[in-house]
């Protein structure tokens, strides 16, 4: 009986809500740091192990996901997807730009176990570009060992295009390997509550409860930027497309897609909800049946915001100077990173080291930033997914309605 009860408890823990478990880990970590500082410092090992597991799996994850995605790409998508695809990419880049502006206006400070003396910052945009180019020609094994994400991306894209000409058995093998790595990532992330318990306990024990205010400020910047994009930037893009008041459509998408996505925390899981909303809005089925799954893959405004804000928070904490051209380049890199963040729990967080590489921030410190992202992830990930998923429907509806009006006007003229 005792064994059955224990196995039942483990099953509930494994299949339970990760959000609730992370909340419990946060609360327990705060309580332990308040009750016993030595005990809180001791359980910091749990957080160290969690961050180490993330560092181990992240480079392989990026390589396999990108390679499998390109190798298994299907040709022959309809040409009327192009306006929606353009909106997706423009929206993601606009979100990254907004995040840069927010981060400079309201700089956040993180508590990292390193000082600016450990960092050799680039002197300007030329050195940043030189570093990026040199990273691109890195040996693939060396790139994986040293977490050189630029080099990993280049090899993943190159191998992906090469494997397009391979037979189906090879493509299936690559896809299966990608699924296996994704499973390992999900397994690691199931330990997030325990890791966060250790991280919060040790952080509060060593730095004090003032750290919570630093995370609160970071959350306000992140969520404030996402609200700016959802309520100002996206409506402007929709108005540019449909030339009328965009807010009825914006609020409908936030209400009927964003709310669901906030709680599911998965763009993929929200695809049926978005499909039903598109049908309710009388959109073209041939269009939204392609654009909604496509949006769940590449339309990642929330991820671009997360990557940009957390990267610039690390840069500000370490005292690394950032000029305007470098900030603009970060917006481009964050947009590209965001497009690769789909389908993985915590995907946007695991791509932060790629953006941090631009500023000479080592992988060890970048993964501490990822750990901070997991601590605030209860709200950050929910808001990010709500923005991402609701924008899928919003831009699809805007493009479809603009096309319908164009056809109607042409019919009237003729």
Curated annotation (Swiss-Prot):
HAMAP family in alphabetical order: Ser_Thr_transp_SstT
Residue ranges of the TM segments: 16-36, 46-66, 84-104, 143-163, 180-200, 219-239, 300-320, 332-352
Domain of life of the organism encoding this protein: Bacteria
Sorted UniProt keywords: Amino-acid transport, Cell inner membrane, Cell membrane, Membrane, Symport, Transmembrane, Transmembrane helix, Transport
Lipid bilayer topology: Multi-pass membrane protein
UniProt record similarity statement: Belongs to the dicarboxylate/amino acid:cation symporter (DAACS) (TC 2.A.23) family.
Organism: Salmonella agona (strain SL483)
Main localization, broad class: membrane
A single GO BP: threonine transport
One annotated GO molecular function: neutral L-amino acid:sodium symporter activity
UniProt function note: Involved in the import of serine and threonine into the cell, with the concomitant import of sodium (symport system).
UniProt catalytic activity: L-serine(in) + Na(+)(in) = L-serine(out) + Na(+)(out); L-threonine(in) + Na(+)(in) = L-threonine(out) + Na(+)(out)
Any Pfam family hit: SDF
Subcellular location as annotated: Cell inner membrane
GO cellular component: plasma membrane
Name assigned to this protein: Serine/threonine transporter SstT
């Amino acid at each position: 009986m005792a064994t059955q009860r224990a196995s039942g408890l483990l099953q509930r823990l494994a299949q339970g809500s990760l959000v609730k478990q992370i909340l419990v880990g946060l609360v327990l970590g705060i309580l332990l740091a308040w009750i016993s500082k030595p005990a809180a410092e001791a359980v910091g090992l749990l957080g160290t192990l969690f961050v180490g597991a993330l560092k181990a799996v992240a480079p392989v994850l990026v390589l396999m996901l990108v390679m499998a995605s390109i190798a298994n790409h299907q040709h022959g998508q309809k040409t009327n997807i192009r306006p929606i695809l353009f909106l997706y990419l423009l929206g993601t880049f606009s979100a990254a730009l907004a995040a840069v502006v927010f981060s400079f206006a309201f700089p956040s400070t993180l508590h990292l176990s390193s000082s600016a003396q450990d960092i050799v910052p680039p002197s300007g945009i030329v050195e940043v570009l030189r570093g990026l180019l040199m990273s691109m020609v890195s040996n693939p094994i060396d790139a994986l060992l040293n977490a050189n994400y630029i080099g990993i991306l280049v090899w993943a894209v190159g191998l992906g295009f090469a494997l397009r000409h391979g037979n189906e058995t090879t493509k299936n093998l690559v896809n299966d390997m990608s699924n296996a790595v994704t499973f390992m990532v999900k397994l690691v992330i199931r330990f997030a509550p325990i890791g966060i318990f250790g991280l919060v306990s040790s952080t509060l024990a060593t730095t004090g409860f003032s750290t919570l205010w630093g995370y609160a400020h970071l959350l306000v910047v992140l969520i404030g930027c996402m609200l700016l994009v959802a309520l100002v930037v996206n409506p402007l893009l929709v108005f540019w497309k449909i030339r009328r008041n965009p807010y009825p459509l914006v609020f409908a998408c936030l209400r009927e897609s964003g709310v669901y996505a906030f709680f599911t925390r998965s763009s993929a899981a929200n695809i049926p909800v978005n499909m039903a909303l598109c049908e309710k809005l009388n959109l073209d089925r041939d269009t939204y049946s392609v654009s909604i799954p496509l949006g769940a893959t590449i339309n990642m405004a929330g991820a671009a915001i997360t990557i940009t804000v957390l990267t610039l928070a690390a840069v500000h904490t370490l005292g690394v100077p950032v000029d305007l051209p470098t900030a603009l380049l970060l917006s481009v890199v964050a947009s590209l990173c965001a497009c690769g963040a789909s389908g993985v729990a915590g995907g946007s967080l695991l791509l932060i080291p790629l953006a941090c590489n631009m500023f000479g921030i080592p992988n060890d410190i970048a993964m501490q930033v990822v750990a901070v992202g997991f601590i605030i992830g209860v709200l950050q990930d929910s808001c990010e997914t709500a923005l991402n998923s609701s924008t899928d429907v919003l831009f699809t509806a805007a493009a479809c309605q603009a096309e319908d009006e164009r056809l109607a006007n042409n019919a009237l003229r003729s």
